[in-house]
Every structure is written in structure tokens, then in C-alpha cells.
Amino acid sequence: MRCVLPWLDSWAAKKPDAAAFEGEKTCLTWRQLHDTAKRIGTYLARQLPPRVPIALCMDKSPMTVAAMLGVLEAGCFYTIIDVQMPQQRVQLILDALHPALLLTDEGKAPIWADAAGKLPCVSTETAASCDIDESLLAARQREIIDTDLQYVLFTSGSTGHPKGVAIRHRSVLDFVEWAVPALRLDETVRFGNQAPLYFDNSVLDIFCTLKSGAYVYFLPQRDFLFPARMMDELEQRQINTLFWVPSALMHPANLGVVKDGRPRGIKRVFFCGEVMPNRQLNIWRRSLPDADFVNMYGPTEITDVCSWYRVDRTFEDGEPLPIGFPCENTRITLVEGEICVSGTCLSAGYYNAPEKTAAAFVQHPDARGIPERMYKTGDLGAYNERGELMFLGRKDSQIKKQGYRIELGEIECAIKACQAVTQGCCFYQAATQQIVCCYSGEDDEKALRGELRRRLPKYMLPDVYYHLPQFPQTMNGKIDRVRLRQELGL
């Protein structure tokens, strides 16, 4: 198998009238998804050669999934550009990608025309009105090989220019073939999707659904601001599987709505993207004692997830959670404490950025006589006494103060374990040699200082404390650390 499309064909034949992807306004059955993708694919194949990038400038919806698959039907690859992205970032992405065409939501093509410049800008309504040409699409599929690109996702770059992470078909196939059996996914699964489609966590929701015949409901973003409403939504939609960033799980736990078996019907809770504090995880586990909880780890450059840990024992609130063991067909190597990853999961590199690619994807030190790439994650790790991999923080968040080597991630873990804290993070001010603690929850600095003194050695205690009503978030739902530092003048 060279790409994901045979999975779509299979479920469209097996259960054509069953709902596949649903949002607030639209729902596509498997047959509708299949046919819409083929119509869009035919339109694109008539306009463009294979293996060119296409930008999808669309809201998150079932039609966006159809457009993604339509791009693959045409033998091309896609980038998702969210409609809420700042115009400057959109332009930087377009400049790096040089897409052959922009696909937009119905009625939005004129709005995107300015950003597109001379690029063709076409609505999905226009593309999906094309008659299906099976012979043309079959010819395109014969040209696909599994090392062709499936998508490019843009992540933040340290220079302010987003980096396009290029992922091949074979990496997605390899990931999904592991994830579906390992995570016990089948056609009874009903995902409540949180991740934006331009965020790599969505790869699991979308493509594991294609493989397993599951169902995805795109939860309205506003509902994450109102956890009580979210609990009702999950139950009304009969959602039984969540794959959310930890911040999205922490908020309802902090507000006390995760209790007494709610949200009812949840059988699986997966999380990835940032550290999940055990204090909030324990709230979920107490409310849903029979659910399967899985902690996953992996940067965008390794196709979503490279290690995983099924939560199989009791943890104290202040204990760190393991990131566990490598996924199948994946090798994790610690090089001077840095987590480095190799295997089929690896990205092809950064699109149109050979220097950045060469710096991050390097020769594996243990591979002798043959080239074998590994990706330097920039994250620090170590193995515990059980042989489980532990995440210790970012390489660039390791500081030295008063002669002591300190992991800021360990301090953050202690902050989040404090009962009165709902969210927390810390920074280091090199100029003043001060550790800065930012927290939300009860505004009681004295109590927080006292609790941290019981958890941390003196040399690790924060010097400065900022109480925040709430933390700024990135579009992916994580703490926006860059914006936070700017707001605090750090």
C-alpha cells in the first residue's frame, strides 16, 4: 500500500451511509466523503501536475477532510492554513511553500485572492462540482510511491519564520498501522476532535478513523471555554474517545466538572503535545476508573507520536508521568541526554530549508557503514528504574544557577502539583539570574511559596511570582510562552 486512499475506498463500500466526519453545520457519510474527494481530485488532476503542493485555506470541517483526501487523489500534497492565522504568517507560509493552487471554503475565494496573488484560488464548491474521472485518478494513483509527500505542516521557527515539516505517505501509513491496534481503535470509536487540522495531533484522529472506520465529531472551539457545556456536548454526541492536548483536559478538571463518572461514555483518553500533570490526570482517572489513559510524546517531525505510555499504575499528584516506550518501528536514542529519534516515522525534512534540515536531521552515531538519519528533538530524557522513558524538559530550558544544574520542567511539575494552582510555567531571566514563576488559580503567593518549599530544594525555588487570571494560548491550545514573556516584559 502506497497511501491512505484504499482505506477510504474500503469503508465507502462497507458502510456508505454511516457518518464519517461531522461538524456543527455539515456531516459527510463515507460515500459522500469518498465521492467528494474524488471530485476534488479530478478537478485538481485536470489543472495540475502530480507532486505539487496545494494550500487548503479552510475552516476545520468535514469538507476540509474531503479536500485533504482530494489532494491525495490528484497525487499532490497539502498544507493546512487556518483562517484565523495572522496575515503575515499566512504570507510567510505561502512564500516558503510556493503552492500551485489555493483551495478555500465556499464563498471565501475572493477573500483569499489578495493573499494568493497570482496563484489560482478555487473554492471547494467549484472543485467538488467536477464529474469524477476514474481513469484519470487511477493513472495518478499508479504514479504515487510511498516516499512521496502527503503533507507539510508548518511549526514555529526560532527566527520567526515558520518551518514546513514535510511528511511522506509511508510515515503516515506506518504510524496508523501501529496506532489502531495499539490504542484498540475500531469502528465503534467516536472521536471528539480538539486538535486543529494544521496541528499534527489531528493526524491520529483523521487517519486512524480512515483505517478503522471510526467516526469524528469536530468539537466547536468555543465549547472548550465552557467545560460544563463541553461535558454535555460529549455525552449528547456519544463521544467515547478523546485525543486532546493536556491544557484542554486540565481546564475542566480544574473547574470541577470532571466527576461522578462524567463525561459519561468515555472509554479512551489520549494526550500529547505538552506535559500532563498527574494532579489533573488523577481527577479524570477517579471519575472514569474504567477508561484507558495513554500519554504520548512526539514532535511534528516524527509524524505525531514516537513514544507512548499506557497509564497502568497509581501516581501521586506531584509525580511526573512517563512517556514510556518507543512506538513500533521507531528507535529512540539518548545522545548526551537529548532524545533523538530514528525510523520510518521521520520527516523528509523542512520544506525548502536544506540548512535547517541538515542541522536537525543528522547521521545516527551507532550506524556504521550506511547512512541512517535521526532527528534531534531538543528535548531531554532519561530512563527510570522501570525502563520507562521520562521527559525532563527542553534542552534549552536547562539552566545553571549558583553552580547547580536545574531543569525548569521539574519546577513546573512542582508548581502544577500545588492544590491551588490551575496552570503554571516558569522562565529563567539570565540577566538577573532569577527563576520566574507564572501561575493561575488562587492568588495566594505566600501559600504557593510555602508549598513549593516542601517540594523543591532551596536552589530551585522561584525568585519572582506572577499571578495570571489566565494564560495566553497558541492556536493548538498550548501555553503561548513567547506571548507570555512579551506581556510580562521578560
What name fits each language-model region?
Residues 1-152, 167, 174, 277-282, ...:
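AMP-binding/adenylate-forming domain of the ANL superfamily
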Residues 8-10, 62-80, 179-182, 202-214, ...:
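Hydrophobic alpha-helical segments in the ANL/AMP-binding
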Residues 58-61, 82, 185, 195-202, ...:
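Conserved AMP-binding
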Residues 137-154, 161, 186-191, 197, ...:
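Conserved pre-ATP/AMP-binding loop-to-beta segment of ANL
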Residues 163-192, 200-240:
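Conserved AMP-binding/adenylation subdomain of ANL enzymes
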Residues 211-214, 240-243, 253-318:
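Gly/Ser/Thr-rich phosphate-binding loop
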